[in-house]
């Protein structure tokens, strides 16, 4: 038994190896075929006996996952995964019985598989040799005819199955390796054939084939021999496999049209598959020869198609392509089906189209309904799901909300506690800071007292020295008086009476006390050297310059004393340096009104409310100014003069001005004259430099002397003359003095605002052309070019640059050494924290000069900025002391008294300590400042006279003015009291007063044009009726002329010769021949149709033939008619002939002699007559007709439709009229358009009538005028007026560019032929100096009176040599006269409301509607007595808001001009505006609110502060 079993096991193992070798052989064969297909695309050259073993073949197996190692690993993994499924018992049973895929092989590793492959390699090679032998034997047996032999039942089924798959391969090709395997081998699985053609069998366990090729079909798979034996053994069980049968029942066809029914060519699928045959097995010799013949015929057809051009060879696709109809370019007649053709013409559809459309529509409906149901179901399911989720998480969500609420409460409590502790910490710091400040304040007062005491002693020494110098030229008593007067002035009007002088002098230490009076004669007897020894310990403050001067020696004391004394006396003797003479004495009524009105302090002007002393925040950007009219002076002592009032000057000099009685005015003027004389004696006179072209006025020469003394004493200074006094020329004269006298040619640096950069350059070229001036501006590249070579000596003398560019290129400017640095408009350099201020401070300069047109401001930070810029360090007792370098200490010294001034306003004079501290502050700055006002030097300037010219309204103006006032809408507007509505009405009234054309333009008259006259409507109807009548007559009437029955007409046009020639042109014979041919053709067509009763239109051929027949009949009829016409025209014969009639006719026209004079006068061309009567036309052609008609020309010339003139003649005449020039064009134009007369421009306006008389007088006397107006449209009217009178003029308005203004002003100032310069008051004031004119005419007054003052200053300024006359035009009995009258009653300055040059709301807040309109105001106006602007309105508090409201009532051009003017005024803001970050103002309010919240818990706050003070908090 054991031996038999062993032998049986060996046989079984040998059989297993044989089967495995067979599988390996087939695997190699199939993989080689796939690789050959991939590489060469075709199997034509494929050799099955060649087994590839290259690297590319192995790479191909790895990429396609066909390697046996990978397949084995995948098979084992799949088996391991599928072993867990309990429903695959049948598959596991098959795997256990299998000899190849056993449970032992599943655990084999990669090395075992390679060993098995090597063991079966000889068997595989034997299989390969057998295949070679079979292939060679098969090639030898090809010539033998295959004989049919009986085959078994299984082979029949396999053959049928192979045939079936061959047919399916043609329709649905399968992978080639499967087909080759099926064709060449008989190792095919035995599967039962389906019983029906439409039944598909699907095996239940498809997963058993996953270990084999994935491309095998479901019905065929490869198995080992052991599996085949197992299948044969299991057949006896008769166990049926589960099958799925799919039975298809196609629907019955509903279309009954036999053309639409498709009949299959085969009755069953089996017959269809059996129709395919294999070339190798199933074909006989006859069938093969027949197949070869068919292929030959097909090939010959293809060649013929290529030769004929029906086919073409495509190289890209390597195939034959048919030729399209476009390429053939042949016309293919398309004859559609008659029924479809008939349907297409009527836009109908056949039955098939209806069915298809209905099916498409129904399918869309089904799809849309299905989608809608699915969407609704999804929505409902989501709602249900969300509901249950919400119900499930309610408790958890409630718990989370409670926890979140507890956390928020805890967080709020922690924040509140922390906030409270922070507040306590801030309070502790404030208390601690107050204590430290108190200590510093005590130390600062001691330091300040020492410093001011030394400054006071220095000033005493300077005054005594000046007294010595003045004694040589004047008596001692006079010098003492002058000295006392100068002392009174230098005290900044701290004294208003002799008693007050003594009191203040005792405090300040500057006046003549008994001790000082005793020392005075002793000092007078001493010389300069002895004074130096006596006051040597009083070392005055001197300026220490930048780093380059640190090694230089400091100036000696005598220089400081002389410079200080000279500058101080100069400033003391000029009454305008620290005292304002602008505030004249006011009468008792004004004083009483001022006493009644409450004073507004500086804190109210700031708009920030009152602040405590400790919390006062000084803002650098604010302008601490107090208007002279808003501050009242009160009595300082009981013995003070009653009419003296202390005012706080707006310029900010912290001074009091003394108002004297009218009787004392003369005494004051005499004192001023004596002071001017003393100034000339006290200041060292310097010669006028030769480089300067031009004459300096007296005060300008004194300014040069003062500037020269500053330079000689090595001191910086501030020239603060009022605007218009010539600070520019004084600066140029200083630089010229340095060049001529000191041989100091610079270079000097002048930093100016951008707007006046060009003005400075022009002033240098005008007054000092000897200087080399470098104007530094342009792009970065241009500025770089200008810097090239500027370090060379004498490259330039003066450099003019703007503030913006000097900061941008500060590195280049810092490297250069400058002699003098001049800052124009220096009052704008007030923010010491800005980079601009720091950059200018660090420049390498020897001297510094500040130019400002406004006095010093009250802001301590600005004062400190100027002091530090002039004196970065001071020297006291021979030591460097940064006296003003510490801003905090400076504010502590002077801040509290100035804060009291700001807070209390007018009551600051009651505080003696405050008054003395302010005086000390100005004593420090006094030696370095020079300021003069226009009022002080007005005797040296031309006088200014103002005249008011009243103008009557013209008739047209009065009519428009009264008509506007009488309107119901105007009355309602004035009665409403609305400010904007009233201003609109006032603006309209002002337009009427300026010129009526601004309110209502005088119209240009034209005639009313009618396209047709009245009779033309009836003529159209008549013409239509006549045409209808003529049409009926033409139908019934026979044309005899056409039939040659009117014989007399032939003699009118034809000659005998022409008639004979025309008769030869007859062609009747040709017509007859063509007609006969067409009739024969038509006869043939008629025979084809026969006697058909009706025409079948559904037959296209029959329809086309019928249409051709109809065309032939029409052609025959037309040719017959043409034959008759030709015959009638050629048969015309004249009786006599035109040639014979012309020969026998005599011309009766008389020829006139053209040389006769009488004939020439009678017969004149139209153009000559028009030229001769031109004067008559110009004189009397003035009446424009009210209405004209355009068709009258045709009626006058006889060119209308009803004219008896023929149509051809009318066309010729009309054409000639178009070609001929119209000599009556001028006459037609004058009668068509009536322009207003030019003289009406003047006589319609009363102001222009007065202006015409005034300009004639000014021109005769050699005067030149400036005419200003607010409205831009008035400039247009003035232009027309000046052109009408022939005046040379120039115009400047808001549209004029800034660079063009300089050219216009220079031309006007130099060209005396130009009489008038018309300007807009809104045209801007930058760069306009019109001193060439001596007359200013205000055609109308501006809303803003500051604009009028600015316009006056353009003419009345430095450089004017003649008296200036100002004429203001006012219309009588109008709004303008009422405003002027009210202004005179209130005694406003210069008849306009000007308050320190600012535009205030007093202009409207003090005027009511009744004041403006007078008796013309309606009686029912309820608010007539109320002011235009109430005190509570926003416009009353904000002038800018008022300007915006007025702009809404003005024209658009005027508003644009005003905006441009304001923009130019603020053009320099970019140079100076560098604001710092500020804290929000509402922080303090929040802190107060927080403190109020915890009111009543002081004990807790005290505990917290004590806790922090004891050091437990930190």
Swiss-Prot record:
The family this protein is said to belong to: Belongs to the SNF2/RAD54 helicase family. SWR1 subfamily.
Chain positions recorded as ATP binding sites: 721-728
List the ranges annotated as motif DEAH box: 824-827
Q: Which organism is it from?
A: Saccharomyces cerevisiae (strain ATCC 204508 / S288c) (Baker's yeast)
Note the superkingdom of the native organism: Eukaryota
The record's EC number reads 3.6.4.12
Which Pfam families does this one have? Answer: Helicase_C, HSA, SNF2-rel_dom
Which SUPFAM superfamilies does the entry link to?
P-loop containing nucleoside triphosphate hydrolases
Domain (HSA): residue spans on this chain: 339-411
Gene encoding the protein? SWR1
Q: Which GO terms describe its cellular component?
A: chromatin; cytosol; nucleus; Swr1 complex
Where does this protein have compositionally biased stretches of type Polar residues?
465-480, 513-524
Name-wise, this protein is: Helicase SWR1
């Amino acid at each position: 038994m054991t031996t038999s079993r062993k032998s049986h096991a060996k046989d079984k193992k040998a059989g297993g190896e044989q089967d495995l070798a067979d599988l390996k052989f087939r695997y190699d064969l199939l993989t080689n075929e796939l690789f050959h297909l991939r590489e060469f695309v075709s199997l034509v050259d494929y050799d099955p006996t060649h087994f590839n073993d290259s690297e590319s073949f192995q790479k191909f197996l790895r990429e396609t996952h066909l390697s046996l190692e990978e397949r084995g690993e995948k098979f084992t993994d799949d088996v391991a995964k599928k072993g867990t499924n309990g429903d695959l018992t049948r598959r596991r049973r098959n795997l256990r019985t299998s000899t190849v895929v056993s449970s032992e092989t599943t655990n084999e590793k990669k090395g075992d598989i390679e060993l098995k492959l090597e063991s079966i390699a000889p068997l595989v090679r034997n299989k390969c040799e057998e295949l070679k032998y079979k292939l060679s034997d098969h090639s030898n047996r090809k010539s033998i005819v295959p004989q049919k032999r009986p085959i078994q039942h299984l082979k029949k089924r396999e053959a049928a199955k192979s045939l079936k798959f061959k047919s399916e391969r043609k329709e649905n090709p399968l992978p080639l390796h499967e087909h080759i395997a099926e064709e060449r081998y008989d190792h095919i699985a035995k599967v039962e054939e389906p019983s029906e053609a439409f039944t598909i069998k699907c095996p239940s366990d498809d997963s058993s084939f996953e270990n084999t090729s994935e491309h095998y079909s479901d019905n065929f798979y490869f198995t080992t021999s052991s599996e085949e034996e197992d299948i044969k053994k299991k057949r006896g069980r008769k166990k049926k496999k589960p099958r799925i049968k799919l039975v298809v029942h196609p629907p019955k066809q509903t279309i009954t049209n036999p053309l639409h029914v498709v009949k299959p060519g085969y009755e069953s699928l089996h017959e269809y598959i059996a129709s395919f045959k294999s070339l190798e097995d199933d074909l006989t010799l006859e069938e093969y020869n027949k197949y070869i013949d068919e292929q030959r015929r097909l090939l010959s057809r293809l060649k013929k198609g290529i030769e004929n051009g029906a086919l073409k060879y495509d190289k890209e696709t390597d195939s034959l392509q048919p030729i399209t109809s476009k390429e053939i370019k042949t016309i293919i007649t398309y004859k559609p089906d008659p029924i479809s053709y008939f349907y297409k013409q009527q836009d109908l559809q056949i039955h098939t189209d209806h069915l298809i459309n209905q099916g498409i529509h129904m399918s869309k409906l089904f799809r849309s309904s299905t989608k809608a149901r699915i969407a609704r179901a999804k929505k409902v399911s989501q709602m249900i799901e969300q509901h249950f989720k919400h119900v499930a998480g309610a408790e958890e969500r409630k718990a989370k909300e409670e926890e979140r609420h507890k956390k928020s409460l805890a967080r709020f409590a922690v924040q509140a506690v922390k906030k409270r502790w922070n507040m306590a910490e801030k309070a502790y710091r404030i208390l601690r800071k107050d204590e430290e400040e108190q200590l510093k304040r005590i130390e600062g007062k001691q330091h300040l007292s020492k410093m001011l005491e030394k400054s006071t002693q220095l000033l005493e020494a300077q005054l005594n020295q000046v007294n010595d110098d003045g004694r040589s030229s004047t008596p001692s008593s006079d010098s003492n008086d002058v000295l006392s007067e100068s002392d009174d002035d230098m005290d900044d009007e701290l004294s208003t009476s002799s008693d007050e002088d003594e009191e203040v002098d005792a405090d300040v230490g500057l006046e003549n006390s008994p001790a000082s009076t005793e020392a005075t004669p002793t000092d007078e007897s001493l010389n300069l050297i002895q004074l130096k020894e006596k006051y040597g310990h009083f070392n005055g403050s001197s300026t220490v310059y930048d780093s380059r001067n640190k090694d230089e020696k400091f100036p000696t004391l005598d220089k400081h004393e002389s410079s200080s004394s000279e500058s101080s006396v100069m400033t003391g003797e000029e009454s305008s340096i620290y005292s304002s003479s602008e505030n004249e004495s006011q009468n008792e009524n004004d004083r009483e009104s001022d006493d009644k009105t409450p004073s507004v302090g500086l804190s109210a002007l700031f708009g920030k409310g009152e602040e405590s002393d400790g919390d006062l925040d000084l803002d650098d950007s604010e302008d601490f100014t107090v208007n002279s009219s808003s501050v009242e002076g009160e009595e300082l002592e009981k013995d003070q003069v009653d009419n003296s009032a202390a005012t706080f000057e707006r310029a900010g000099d912290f001074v009091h001005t003394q108002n004297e009685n009218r009787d004392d005015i003369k005494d004051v003027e005499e004192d001023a004259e004596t002071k001017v004389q003393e100034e000339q004696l006290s200041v060292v006179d310097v010669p006028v430099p030769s480089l300067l072209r031009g004459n300096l006025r007296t005060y300008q020469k004194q300014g040069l002397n003062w500037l020269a003394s500053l330079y000689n004493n090595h001191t910086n200074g501030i020239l603060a003359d009022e605007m218009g006094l010539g600070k520019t020329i004084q600066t140029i004269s200083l630089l010229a003095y340095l060049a001529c006298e000191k041989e100091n040619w610079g270079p000097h640096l002048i930093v100016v605002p951008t707007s006046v950069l060009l003005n400075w350059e022009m002033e240098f070229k005008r007054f000092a052309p000897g200087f080399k001036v470098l104007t530094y501006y342009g792009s970065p590249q241009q500025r770089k070019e200008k810097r090239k070579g500027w370090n060379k000596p004498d490259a330039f003398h003066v450099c003019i640059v703007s503030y913006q560019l000097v900061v941008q290129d500060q590195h280049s400017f810092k490297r250069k050494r400058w002699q003098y640095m001049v800052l124009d408009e220096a009052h704008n350099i007030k923010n010491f924290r800005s980079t601009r201020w720091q950059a200018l401070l660090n420049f390498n300069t020897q001297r510094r000069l500040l130019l400002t047109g406004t006095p010093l401001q009250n802001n301590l930070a600005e004062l400190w900025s100027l002091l530090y810029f002039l004196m970065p360090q001071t020297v006291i007792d021979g030591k460097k002391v940064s006296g003003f370098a510490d801003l905090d200490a400076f504010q502590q010294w002077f801040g509290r008294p100035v804060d009291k001034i700001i807070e209390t306003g007018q009551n600051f004079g009651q505080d003696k300590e405050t008054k003395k501290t302010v005086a000390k502050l100005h004593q420090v700055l006094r030696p370095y400042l020079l300021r003069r006002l226009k009022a002080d030097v007005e005797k040296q300037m031309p006088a200014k006279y103002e005249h008011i010219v009243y103008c009557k309204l013209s008739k047209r103006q009065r009519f428009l003015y009264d008509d506007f006032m009488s309107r119901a809408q105007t009355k309602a507007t004035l009665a409403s009291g609305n400010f904007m509505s009233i201003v609109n009405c006032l603006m309209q009234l002002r337009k009427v007063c300026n010129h009526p054309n601004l309110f209502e333009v005088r119209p240009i008259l034209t005639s009313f044009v009618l396209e047709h006259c009245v009779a033309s409507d009836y003529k159209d109807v008549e013409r239509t009726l006549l045409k209808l009548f003529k049409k009926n007559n033409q139908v019934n009437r026979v044309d005899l002329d056409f039939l040659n029955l009117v014989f007399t007409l032939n003699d009118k046009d034809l000659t005998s010769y022409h008639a004979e020639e025309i008769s030869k042109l007859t062609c009747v014979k040709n017509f007859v021949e063509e007609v006969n041919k067409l009739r024969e053709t038509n006869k043939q067509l008629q025979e084809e149709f026969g006697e058909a009763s009706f025409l079948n239109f559904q037959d296209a051929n029959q329809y086309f033939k019928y249409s051709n027949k109809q065309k032939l009949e029409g052609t025959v009829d037309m040719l017959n008619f043409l034959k008759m016409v030709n015959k009638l025209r050629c048969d015309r014969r004249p009786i006599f002939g035109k040639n014979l009639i012309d020969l026998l006719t005599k011309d009766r026209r008389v020829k006139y002699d053209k040389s006769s004079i009488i004939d020439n006068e009678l017969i004149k061309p139209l153009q000559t007559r028009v030229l001769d009567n031109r004067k008559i036309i110009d004189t009397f052609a003035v009446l424009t007709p009210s209405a004209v008609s355009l068709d009258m020309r045709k009626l006058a010339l006889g060119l209308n439709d009803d004219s008896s003139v023929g149509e051809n003649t009318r066309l010729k005449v009309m054409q000639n009229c178009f070609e001929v020039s119209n000599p009556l064009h001028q006459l037609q134009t004058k009668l068509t358009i009536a322009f207003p007369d030019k003289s009406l421009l003047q006589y319609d306006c009363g102001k222009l009538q007065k202006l015409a008389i005034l300009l004639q007088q000014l021109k005769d006397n050699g005067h030149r005028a400036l005419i200003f107006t607010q409205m831009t449209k008035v400039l247009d009217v003035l232009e027309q007026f000046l052109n009408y009178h022939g005046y040379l003029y120039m115009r400047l308005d808001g549209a004029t560019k800034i660079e063009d203004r300089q050219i216009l002003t220079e031309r006007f100032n130099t060209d005396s032929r130009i009489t008038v310069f018309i300007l807009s008051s809104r045209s801007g004031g930058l760069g306009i100096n019109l001193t060439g004119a001596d007359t200013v005419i205000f055609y109308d007054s501006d809303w803003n009176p500051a604009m009028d003052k600015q316009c006056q200053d353009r003419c009345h300024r430095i450089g004017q040599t003649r008296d200036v006359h100002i004429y203001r035009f006012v219309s009588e009995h109008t709004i303008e006269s009422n405003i002027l009258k009210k202004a005179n009653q209130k005694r406003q300055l210069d008849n306009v409301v000007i308050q320190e040059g600012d535009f205030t709301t007093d202009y409207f807040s003090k005027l009511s509607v009744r004041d403006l309109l007078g008796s013309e105001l309606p009686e029912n106006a309820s608010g007539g007595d109320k002011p235009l602007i109430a005190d509570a309105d926003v416009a009353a508090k904000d002038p800018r808001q008022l300007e915006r409201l007025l702009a809404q009532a003005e024209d658009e051009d005027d508003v644009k001009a005003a905006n441009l003017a304001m923009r130019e005024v603020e053009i320099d803001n970019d140079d100076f505006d560098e604001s710092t970050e500020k804290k929000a103002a509402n922080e303090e309010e929040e802190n107060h609110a927080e403190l109020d919240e915890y009111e009543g818990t002081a004990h807790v706050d005290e505990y917290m502060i004590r806790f922090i003070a004891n050091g437990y908090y930190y």
